[in-house]
Amino acid sequence: MFSVRYKAIALSALLLLFGCLCGCEKGSGAYIFKAAIVGNPKTLDPQTALADSSANIIYNTFRGLFGYDTEGNIVPDMAESYSVSGDGLEWTFTLRGGVYWYADDFSAKCTADDFVFAFRRLINPAVKSAGAADFFVLKNAEKINKGTMTDLSLLGVEAVNETTLKITLEYPDSDLPVLLASSAAMPCNEEFFETTEGRYGLSADCVASNGAFYVHTWSYDEWSEDSNYFILRRNTLNVPPDDESIPVGMNFFIDAKEACSDFCDGTFGAYITDSAEEISELSGKYTYNTYETAVWGLVFNPKRFSDAQLRLKFAEKCTFSDSDCYRSAWRITPPFNYGEKNSASLSADDIEMPASVNVVMPQNMELREQMNAVAQEWRTSFGISCSVFEPETQTYEQRLQSGDYDIALVRISGTNSSKYAYLSAFLSNSPRNFTGQNSKKFDHILDSAKKEQNEAIRESYYSEAESFLLESGLFAPVCSQTDYVFFGKKSQGMCYNPYLGAYIAIK
């Protein structure tokens, strides 16, 4: 999932990664970029969107204060320039002129008021944005979001004039630009928002764009396999028709069944896979990059596995073997297999075992084989019945959200390479926290890390937080995942961001 936390990024690590991630060849933009995406987004409202698939649309149709350049550096975008006060609490932004909103029958200049309205929506408890807590660094944001303060105008975001925005913080945060490059920090035009009458972000005609493209068509029918797609076309108010640095449009196909063959015949401009068979077939023919940005691990039902020793006992007997796309992992934060493997202290063998265990995992052939081998190990070692289930994607996600599992295999990825980006998945208020347990101790450790200005002390907090999860068996890492991204001829001007899981057109 995406758009949950963007703090405390290690800039040097980001530069090293992005230095080789771009398939950005400049050339004729007189083409339409086409690619497959996984899953239909529930919304394109930047303040509430979570799905990876929405990132492909949002990051090409919206411009925030900060964005990414072709090397992956976080750079000013809508912010033409900015200054920071001596105490680090006030950030003042001068916005670019000549940037416009566009939707059918609507156009308007993008101004500082659009950012104020967006941040107020984000923090407003009535909106119930899962990303609100990430922005508690804004003055009064936490009080407003938790209901102890009700006046939204007291939020530390102010439009000084049409082109000047002032943001006031609760505490200094030198990594604020990383946060402001996130989806949740994208602007929102209040006038257009009101015209959607509660349907903002839910259909193509309920999305206004201040970016290079706008949503022309959003077609989705859950009973159809070939009518599910997005069509983005150039927002000519922001990018001239004769600008050839980026495509003239984009088509994203939702859950395309023949994505690999569509890439091979030149229909798609890029293709992502973790299939060993496809990698072997494509690697000698196309340019590609690899990204190890996700870790898979086990989470346990909090009722059936309330005993930490029981969780650790099962985790101890769970070992995945290495392959091209999956490597054994024992850490939650990257690098996932760095240093010594954690050896948790186990009690005597008198732990009461459940008679049977059901494991839920997403559909994945290679991981299925690994998980079945682990299930057999549990049967042999513990003398229990163990079954592995692979429901459809939507059912799998529903079971995770409702806690309908004994053990679940889940994927954790960060929105950047920082430790916070991964560990924040286990915060009590995180929609990615599938452990079913809310730990005030863990929340306090991460909150301390977030506010700590000393890098060494901050790192010690992160180590403490990760050790807490591992030693209590709340999350048991089993393997990291490497994605292969192949680029075809029709990908000029496009870059791939592995943390956002998105193809982005960058001038």
Show the residue positions of the predicted features.
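Gly/Pro-rich hinge or "lid" segments in bacterial periplasmic/extracellular proteins
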Residues: 152-153, 162-163, 168-245, 257
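N-terminal lobe/hinge region of extracytoplasmic solute-binding protein
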Residues: 36-86, 208, 499
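Short, well-ordered beta-strand elements
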Residues: 30-39, 90-93, 115-118, 165-166, ...
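Alpha-helical secondary-structure segments
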Residues: 113-115, 162-166, 265, 292-334, ...
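Ligand-site clamp/hinge motif
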Residues: 231-280
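Ligand/substrate-recognition segments at binding pockets and active sites
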Residues: 224-227, 351-414
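Detector for C-terminal structural segments
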Residues: 315-341, 366-375, 400-507
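Aromatic- and charge-enriched surface segment that lines or borders ligand/interaction sites
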Residues: 81-134, 306
